[in-house]
Swiss-Prot record:
InterPro entries in the cross-refs: Asp/Glu-ADT_sf_sub_c, GatC
Lineage top rank: taxon: Bacteria
Name of this protein: Aspartyl/glutamyl-tRNA(Asn/Gln) amidotransferase subunit C
Assembly with partners or alone: Heterotrimer of A, B and C subunits.
Keyword S-adenosyl-L-methionine: no
Family annotation (SUPFAM superfamilies): Glu-tRNAGln amidotransferase C subunit (SSF141000)
Length: 96
């Protein structure tokens, strides 16, 4: 299956992606590579794999909550480069 520009535009609109005109060709190429890979995976013969082989056997590895010693707010403030009103002050990383 190959996507065309119209399909890409519809997908971008539905997923609220803003694809710039100069990125359109590369994005379309990337989507088509992904779809080619999906087609390859769909074509694999998995009839010899038992259903119980698919699931991972994994035990719950969450540690129990234990109340213990902890640092006071004053001790934590000593380690922080910037601390204000009970919170760590960090550089802004997401612009709105």
């Amino acid at each position: 299956m190959n996507l065309n520009e119209d399909s890409l535009r519809k997908i971008a609109e539905l997923s609220r992606l803003n694809i710039r005109p100069k990125e359109k060709e590369a994005t379309l190429r990337d989507f088509n590579k992904i779809l080619e890979y999906v087609d390859q995976v769909k074509g694999l013969d998995v009839s010899s794999i038992r259903d119980d082989e698919i699931y991972f056997r994994h035990e719950n590895s969450i540690r129990p909550d234990l109340v213990g010693q902890h640092l006071s707010r004053e001790e934590i403030e000593k380690f922080a480069p910037s601390f204000q009103n009970g919170y760590f002050v960090v550089p802004k990383v997401i612009e709105t």
